[in-house]
Amino acid sequence: MNDTTAKTLNCSPASRDGFPETLGDFGRTRVDLPVVLVAGPTGVGKTAFAVELARALGSEIVNADSMQVYRHMDIGTAKPTPRERSAVPHHLIDIVDPDEPFDAGDYLARARPVIATLHEAGKVPIVVGGTGLYLKVLTRGICAGAPGDPDVRRRLIEEELTLGLPALHERLRDVDPPLGARIHPNDRQRILRALEVFHHSGKPLSYWQRQHRFEDAPYRTLKIFLHRPREVLYARINDRVDAMMAQGFLDEVRNLLAMGCGPELKPMQSLGYRQMARHLRGEMSLDEAVNEIRRDTRRYAKRQLTWFRADPEYRWFDAADTHGLVARIVRETPDLHDNRLR
């Protein structure tokens, strides 16, 4: 690595629409192992940008989307197309079946060795996804002390069906006020996880999080967040849902149900799959299911924006000019290519 990259990342909110310094000034740590993180809300265009960047840098992509790890769930998770995956090697896609437990700890255990292998090969890993928790544990470690229990989780899911998610969120606010205030009332997975930890351990998840000491950053990271104007993003989300339906999303869910993937499985409770399964069970019309997917996807995108706004290390860029951004990365970060890691 050359000495021009030794400055510490300094990204203030006012600088998020562009670089306050050169790209070569991204954060250096004790361990000089560069990683590019590409985040953004669902539908913004992360995959296309990451493929273009990986080709320009002669690198490979590491998935950081919590749903793309599952086999047989392709359309609803918007996995990279066969053409994109043939253009650039992708890692951590299709690695577990829908009935296999998989969480942030499992992701960390899988991702770190892949990144190490790419570094050994002289390549800069490009980690891509919108799952903020996966990106966070990759760079900061994980709160491993918070215990969970599958039986408690199943009981909570049953309560959700009878009482509704708002009632569970209100309970969370009672038993864990700090976390209940931070978690959005529609953030189903985090509500269930927090209540699971509380009912199993007798202590709120915020207690376990306070016990965790974040590790020193193991990588030198360039954190890129792609965004678009809200009306543009929402239009892209609506178009994506329409495209999913045209590609056979309903049949994909029907096949998963035929394979024995019931509503109790975490992947089947996710956005899109939950609504299609409810339609197939006769609980809502197809139009109702599609409209709910559109609405909930827009809400999910809004939560993603809120999550990443809280991390000042991400540099925000309009996804409409990804070609220019790739060219700038290549021009201003010479240590990220030309086999400089060898």
UniProtKB/Swiss-Prot annotation:
Positions that bind substrate: T42, G43, V44, G45, K46, T47
Catalysed reaction, written as an equation: adenosine(37) in tRNA + dimethylallyl diphosphate = N(6)-dimethylallyladenosine(37) in tRNA + diphosphate
Top-level EC class: transferase
Site positions for Interaction with substrate tRNA: T131, R154
GO BP annotations, alphabetical order: tRNA modification
Region (Interaction with substrate tRNA): 65-68, 189-193
Classification via SUPFAM superfamilies: P-loop containing nucleoside triphosphate hydrolases
Similarity section: Belongs to the IPP transferase family.
Descriptive protein name: tRNA dimethylallyltransferase
